[in-house]
Structures are given as C-alpha cells and as structure tokens.
C-alpha cells in the first residue's frame, strides 16, 4: 500500500490565489458600488451625522423712554407638559402637587392625564417663579419649556403707543409693529461639527455669535408726563362721561412727542382680553373737525397775507347768512340777541377770546378763496399732502375740499374759518400749534429717537409695578451661554447629553427638549442670555444715541417755515388773552403765562350732515408763552353732560397737567401773584 501523498504545493498556491482574487474582486466591486453609485448619498448621510445646525435665540430689543426707563422688555415664560407614561408616582399624587401651583382643581388635572399618554399641555405662559416652583417638585414626566415673553411694566399707560407682540413674538400694533425691523434681531444659524458621542466641537463655534448688542429703541416719550396725562385724562373722561379722549404733549422746538395718551386703552400683556378697535392709535389715525381750535391758524394766515392788521375791528352781528346756510355764534339767541358780542365791533383779540364764528367769517372774507386754499395746502392739509407719519402705524392724511369746490361754494371757506368742513388728526393739530409756539416752523412730530446704548447696565428697582418673577437682562452676545460664562457645549459635555438626543425631540423655533429626563427639559438656544437680573428704576439717565431714525433726522434738518416770527408772537399774545379774558379761563393758573384755545365741533353722521347731539370738544395750550416748551392738546369725543364745551370738559384736564408739570419741573412763577388781604 502506497503511503498518502499530499497535494502538490502548486495546487495549494493556486487555491490560495483563487480565493484571494475572488475576495479582491468582491471587495473591489463593493468599493466601486459604494464610491460611484452610492458615494453622493453616503457623503450626505455622513455630513448629517457629523454636523448639527442650531438656530440661536435672539430676544427683541427693549423699548425705553427718553430717560432710559424700560417700557417693553423680554423675559421668560414656561409651558408645562406632562408625560404620564413616565410618572414614577401615581397620577393622583402628581395632580395634588401641581394643583396649588397651577391654581387648577386636582380632579381637572387628573381628567387630562391618561396613564399611557404623553405630551399633555397643562399650562402655558407661566411666570418664571411659578416655573421654578414646579421644577423644585422634581417630578418625573413633568417638563418645563422655556420661551421668551414680552413684558410691559406700565400696562395701559403706554399701551396705545407701544403696542404688543403676538405669541410668535412678532409686533402687531404700535411701535412694536412699526419698528419691527429695529426691534427684532436676526437669529443666525450655527452649523457645527459633533464628535462620536454627539458633543459639539468647541472650536467650530464662530466668535461672531458672541458679539454683544445692548441697544434699546429709545422713544421721545417722557414716562413721568405720560403718567400725569393718563391720570388727568382718565379723571376728565369720568367727569364729562366722554366716549373716548386723548392727550398729546409735544416739544414745539423739535417735534418730539413727550406724551401720547388715548383712552380707553388696553394692557399689552393681555391684549387678547380687549376689543380689537383699541389697538389702533386713533390720535394719529382718526380724523375730526377741529372747530374753534383752528381759529388761531386762520388768524395767522390772515396776518401773513396782510389781509388784516392786529388792530383791525370787525362787526359781529352774531348771525350771518352765507349762501343757503346760516352761521351763528355759539352763544347767539336768534330771539333775543345778547348784549355782549352781537351788534358790536370787536378787535381780533376779542373775537378770538370769545370764539366768535361770525367774526372769523368776516376775517376770512378778506382773503380770496384760492389764496386761502393754497395756505391750507402749505400747512400740509388735504390729500395732496402725505399722511403725517409719527413712527406709529396706520397714519391718516387730513381732509380738505378740492380747490374748485372751495372756490365755487362760498360756504366752504366760511365753514373752514371756524374749523368745520376740514378734518385732521389730533396729532396734526398739535403740529400746527407747535408752529405757533416755535416761531413759525412746521416741525415733524416723531416718537422714535433711535437705537441707544444705556448709560448703565443695571438699575435698581424702585416704585415700579413689576411681576413677581425675575426679569432677565438680555445679553445678545452670549447666545450659547447656559449660565454665567459657561457655553452650552460645555454644559452638554459635562452633563453627558448627546446632541443627537436633543435632535430627536426638537421643538418649534429652535427649541430643544429632553422629555424623558428628570427635570432636565431646557431650551438649548433660549438660555442664550445670562441670568443677570434686570432691575428697573424710574430715574433719569441719558442713554447714548447711536442710530437716529429717519423721522428724528427729518424733524431736525428738514422742517419748513410757514409763519413769520412776528405773526406767531402776536398769536401767542392773543392766545394768552383767551386764558385771561375768554373761553379758556378754566385753564388759568395763577403766576404762569399760558396760551390756549377751546374748541367744540359737531360730528358727522353716517347719513351725511352734522349730528345735533354728538360733539367733539378740545383744548389746545402753549406753555409757557414767554418761552414755549410744551404744546398740550386734549380732545374729548362725545362728552355726555349738559352744555358740553371745550372750556368745561377739555380745558380742566390741561390745567391739571400744567399744574403737575409746574410741580415736577420746579417751574417758578413768571407773573407776580397778587394776594388780596381779607378784612
């Protein structure tokens, strides 16, 4: 028997070569398939696994008054979500613990919680202190989602001016709407690499994200004056039972709006509880016929055209027919003429002091209608002029009859002589009075000064109505800062949290949730700002103006002259006589020089013509007349007391404001106070 002989080495080599070649063939084929056919898809998949895109949170800029006092600020609110599937205690126990904090009956909470359900919203928009109380309970399956909330500390006092933001943090009214681009910062996106554990690679974070922006939108408003006007108007409306009212205070030299109050107002913090018509800033949107408050402007026009001189006298018969219409003075009695004004000659100052309609008709008869119309157009009245923009939305243009109608119908210039037949917004009339106060310059009213950097980072709270939760100071530079100076990627690394876990539970608008961890639900990008508390103090400090607005530049550089200095000086003296000897005596303040004019006008009806019962009363004042610093206009819509006039409805409101102004500004009397010695 032959011994066993193994196969030759050639056979074995061939077998090894064949197996190796076959393996290389399959490997090469697989590589070709992955590289050429699936390469693009695999590359995209790898990038998705190795990078993460996060949207950083950018709070809105604060809105502050002229002294830097915040009027609108960003703070934090919480939404509470429950996941009964992950409760470590019974539903009843969870409901009992949450009930006193949420102020919801325990049984009602239990009805919402299904044992196998998840993601149940129990409450939303909770203040920060309430959120912290819930977090302190350390309940498994209860998540708190942070999100920004706009807070308005002065509520109805500035509601009509500031406006509000909706649930998506977008401005919907007032300054919040008109200055949306200045208030809303762009939210940059961050694309960064992550390691195999899902932790952000720190050197991938661009330094640009940490650039600070502490700018606030500064207004011309003076909060202290705003409070005074709000209180005076509220009391005045109650006294005269008016439908609505407004107070405007302008700086006649610059056009800056120091005060804009409109009642009834609304609380921007809970805007959804108020009717939608209150969101409109009607002092800049709604037209009305100014009535007798327009008479000083007509006298100024007559003086400028040389149609009259200051010492001229006019026959005032108390009643006059113009075309098919009869015009009477307010105090005229057709059956028994009063001995005061009718059937007498009076100088212009007397006609204005007693608010004579007939006297004004005679004055304007000396001016050709086309010239008078051109002067009204020069004052930017009528459709030819653009709406008077004041940084508030929905501004309206004034109303003036067409020149052909104005010339062909003699009643039109006659009615305009005492402020009827033409219409304007309250802010427009205040602008015209500012031209009388500043020497004849038609300044442009504006509300927004520009973007300013506060002179102080922190102010201490004092005498301000703040909510019970802390208000955080925005620090736009530290977008990715979790706590003071600890970047988020370090927090995630220290906590062992994977970014991939965050991505699985991403929420709307860049909100990242960890719903299955104990009390760990956080907003990754919304702990962007530091936890420094913003404390408020209503004390004056001047912010540094960095970027003035277009309107502010226009007001200082592009104002135009409409009246001469001599004419406005005469008008100031006449308006002062209205306070001393005329219909404005109810605004007299002893020791101080005030100029003003009352106004009462009929309202239009929907059917056409004028209402016999509904009127608008007003009072415009310039204070002090020797050096005008304030133009104050009060308008009352539909006062409902017997014998309602501007003198007994609007003028007392202006007097109250001036008395408060004197007190807070420490203004000394300029006229000797005569004290009568009593026997």
UniProtKB/Swiss-Prot annotation:
Taxonomically, the superkingdom here is Eukaryota
Molecular functions per Gene Ontology: penicillin binding; serine-type D-Ala-D-Ala carboxypeptidase activity
Major localisation: plastid
Tell me which SUPFAM superfamilies the record gives.
beta-lactamase/transpeptidase-like, Penicillin binding protein dimerisation domain
Listed GO biological process terms: cell wall organization; proteolysis; regulation of cell shape
Keyword list (alphabetical) reads: Carboxypeptidase, Cell shape, Chloroplast, Hydrolase, Membrane, Peptidoglycan synthesis, Plastid, Protease, Transmembrane, Transmembrane helix
Kindly give the membrane topology term recorded for this protein: Single-pass membrane protein
Which spans are transmembrane here? 13-33
The listed locations are: Plastid, Chloroplast membrane
Q: List the disulfide bonds.
A: none
Q: Where is the active site?
A: 292 (acyl-ester intermediate)
Per the UniProt entry, the Enzyme Commission number(s) are 3.4.16.4
One GO term describing the cellular component: chloroplast membrane
Q: Which reaction does it catalyse?
A: Preferential cleavage: (Ac)2-L-Lys-D-Ala-|-D-Ala. Also transpeptidation of peptidyl-alanyl moieties that are N-acyl substituents of D-alanine
**To which protein family does this belong?**
Belongs to the transpeptidase family.
Q: What else is known?
A: The presence of this gene in the chloroplast genome suggests there may be an unsuspected vestigal peptidoglycan layer in this organism's chloroplasts.
What PANTHER family does the annotation carry? PEPTIDOGLYCAN D,D-TRANSPEPTIDASE, PEPTIDOGLYCAN D,D-TRANSPEPTIDASE FTSI
In its UniProt entry, what is this protein called? Peptidoglycan D,D-transpeptidase FtsI homolog
What gene name is listed for this protein? ftsI
């Amino acid at each position: 028997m032959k011994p066993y002989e193994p196969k030759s080495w050639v056979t074995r080599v061939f077998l090894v070569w064949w197996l190796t070649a076959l393996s290389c063939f399959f490997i090469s084929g697989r590589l070709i398939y992955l590289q050429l056919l699936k390469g693009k898809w695999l590359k995209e998949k790898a990038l998705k696994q190795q990078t993460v895109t996060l949207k950083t949170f950018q709070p809105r800029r604060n809105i502050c008054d002229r002294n830097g006092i915040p009027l609108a600020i960003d703070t934090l609110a919480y939404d509470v979500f429950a996941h009964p599937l992950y409760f470590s205690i019974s539903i009843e126990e969870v409901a009992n613990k949450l009930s006193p904090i949420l102020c919801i009956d325990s049984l009602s909470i239990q009805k919402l919680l299904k044992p196998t359900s998840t993601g149940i919203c129990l409450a939303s928009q909770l203040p920060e202190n309430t959120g912290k109380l819930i977090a302190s309970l350390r309940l498994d399956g209860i998540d708190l989602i942070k999100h920004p909330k706009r807070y308005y500390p002065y509520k109805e006092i500035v509601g009509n001016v500031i406006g509000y933001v909706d649930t998506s943090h977008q401005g919907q009214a007032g300054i919040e709407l008109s200055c949306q681009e200045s208030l809303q910062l762009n939210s940059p996106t961050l694309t960064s690499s992550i390691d195999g554990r899902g932790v952000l690679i720190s050197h991938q974070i661009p330094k640009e994200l940490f650039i600070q922006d502490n700018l606030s939108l500064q207004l011309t408003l003076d909060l202290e004056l705003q409070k005074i006007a709000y209180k005076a108007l509220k009391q005045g409306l109650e006294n005269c039972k008016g439908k609505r009212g407004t107070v405007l205070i302008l700086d006649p030299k610059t056009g800056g709006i120091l005060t804009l109050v409109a009642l009834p107002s609304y609380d921007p913090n809970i805007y959804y509880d108020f009717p939608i018509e209150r969101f409109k800033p009607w002092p800049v949107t709604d037209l009305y016929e100014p009535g007798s408050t327009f008479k000083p402007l007509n006298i100024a026009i007559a003086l400028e055209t040389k149609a009259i001189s200051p010492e001229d006298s006019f026959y005032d018969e108390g009643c006059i027919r113009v075309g098919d219409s009869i015009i009477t003075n307010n105090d005229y009695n057709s059956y028994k003429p009063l001995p005061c004004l009718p059937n007498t000659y009076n100088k212009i100052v007397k006609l204005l002091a007693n608010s004579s309609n007939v006297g004004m008709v005679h004055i304007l008869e000396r001016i050709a209608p086309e010239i008078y119309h051109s002067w009204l157009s020069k004052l930017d009245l009528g459709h030819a002029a653009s709406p008077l923009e004041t940084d508030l939305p929905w501004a309206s243009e004034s109303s003036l009859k067409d020149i052909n109608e104005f010339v062909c119908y003699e009643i039109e210039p006659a009615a305009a002589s005492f402020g009827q037949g033409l219409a304007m917004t309250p802010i427009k009339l205040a602008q015209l009075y500012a031209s009388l106060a500043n020497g004849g310059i038609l300044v442009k009213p504006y509300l927004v000064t520009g973007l300013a950097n506060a002179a102080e980072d922190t102010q201490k709270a004092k005498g301000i109505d703040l909510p019970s939760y802390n208000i955080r100071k925005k620090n736009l530079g530290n977008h990715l800062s979790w706590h003071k100076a600890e970047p988020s990627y370090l927090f995630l690394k220290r906590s062992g949290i994977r970014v991939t876990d965050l991505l699985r539970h991403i929420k709307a608008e860049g909100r990242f949730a960890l719903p299955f961890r104990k009390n760990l639900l956080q907003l990754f990008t919304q702990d962007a700002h530091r936890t420094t508390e913003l404390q408020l103090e209503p004390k004056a400090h001047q912010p540094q103006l960095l970027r003035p607005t277009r309107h502010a530049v226009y007001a200082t550089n592009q104002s135009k002259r409409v009246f001469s200095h001599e004419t406005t000086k005469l008008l100031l003296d006449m308006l002062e006589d209205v306070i001393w000897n005329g219909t404005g005596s109810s605004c007299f303040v002893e020791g101080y020089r005030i100029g003003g004019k009352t106004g009462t006008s009929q309202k239009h009806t929907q059917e056409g013509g004028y209402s016999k019962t509904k009127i608008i009363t007003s009072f415009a004042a310039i204070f002090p007349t020797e050096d005008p610093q304030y133009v104050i206009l009060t308008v009352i819509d539909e006062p409902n007391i017997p014998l309602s006039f501007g003198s007994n409805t609007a003028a007392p409101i202006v007097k109250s404001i001036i008395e408060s102004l004197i007190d807070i500004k420490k203004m000394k009397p300029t006229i000797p106070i005569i004290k009568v010695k009593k026997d």
